[in-house]
From Swiss-Prot:
GO terms for biological process: translation. Residues 39-109 form the KH type-2 domain. It is found in: Plastid, Chloroplast. This is Small ribosomal subunit protein uS3c. Gene3D superfamilies: 3.30.300.20, Ribosomal protein S3, C-terminal domain. It comes from Gracilaria tenuistipitata (Red alga). The lineage of its organism: Eukaryota, Rhodophyta, Florideophyceae, Rhodymeniophycidae, Gracilariales. The keyword rRNA-binding applies. Keywords: Chloroplast, Plastid, Ribonucleoprotein, Ribosomal protein, RNA-binding, rRNA-binding. Pfam families: KH_2, Ribosomal_S3_C. One of its GO terms (molecular function) is rRNA binding. Part of the 30S ribosomal subunit. Belongs to the universal ribosomal protein uS3 family. HAMAP family: Ribosomal_uS3_B.
Length: 209
């Protein structure tokens, strides 16, 4: 039976960094790791339509800095800029401790270069019951604007309501998953439709600088 390795976890320390930055002793580590999970879950649930590609957590002595990379910062800020303060209070309530939280928004200027946002685009279109081939073609057109060396899109499930689930994939260029030095961005999303669950995988090889 084939063993699958996550393309991003496989490259941590080589071409990818961790999504959290902090140190802890053995006793405190589980608690802090769970807090990171709660922070990310709360943000993703409350701001599911804000086009967030990365939530980076940086811990200091009694302070947690949350850096949110988003293509739509206006949705997070809300009217009169109160959205950020409301989110901060929500996170502090979720953690249920005295930890001070600071939130920093980082705007994404080119969403077509973010694998997470392209995968979300595919999911949103599939939820609207648009034909999957048309959705893949639209996603490929967006991805090609980023001028990357390779693109791969895979959609699986009961596509277009077919009786038998199948996998459809499109590849352009090269996406070397076994080359650790390759700068690959990857995202996996699922969506619920009236026919069942569909899985979406999107990955691309970044252009060399």
């Amino acid at each position: 039976m084939g063993q699958k390795t996550h393309p991003l976890g496989f490259r941590i320390g080589i071409t990818r960094d961790h999504k959290s930055s902090w140190f802890s002793n053995i006793k405190s580590y589980p608690k802090l790791a769970q807090e990171d999970y709660k922070i990310r879950s709360c943000i993703e649930k409350q701001l599911h339509n804000a086009s967030i590609s990365l939530i980076y957590i940086d811990r200091k002595v009694a302070q947690v800095q949350v850096h949110i990379h988003t293509a739509r910062p206006g949705i997070i800020l809300g009217k009169l800029g109160r959205g950020l303060e409301d989110l901060r209070k929500k996170l502090e309530t979720t953690l249920k401790n005295d930890t001070q939280i600071r939130i920093n928004l980082i705007e994404i200027t080119d969403p077509d270069k973010e694998a997470t946002l392209i995968a979300e685009f595919i999911v949103q279109r599939l939820e609207k019951r648009i034909a999957f081939r048309r959705v893949i073609r639209q996603a490929m057109q967006r991805a090609q604007k980023a001028k990357n060396q390779g693109i791969k899109i895979q959609v699986s499930g009961r596509l277009n309501g077919s009786e038998i689930a199948r996998i459809e994939s499109v590849r352009e260029g090269r996406v070397p998953l076994q080359t650790l030095r390759a700068h690959i961005d990857y995202s996996y999303k699922t969506t619920h439709t009236i026919y069942g669950i569909l899985g979406v995988k999107y990955g691309y090889l970044k252009e060399k600088k």
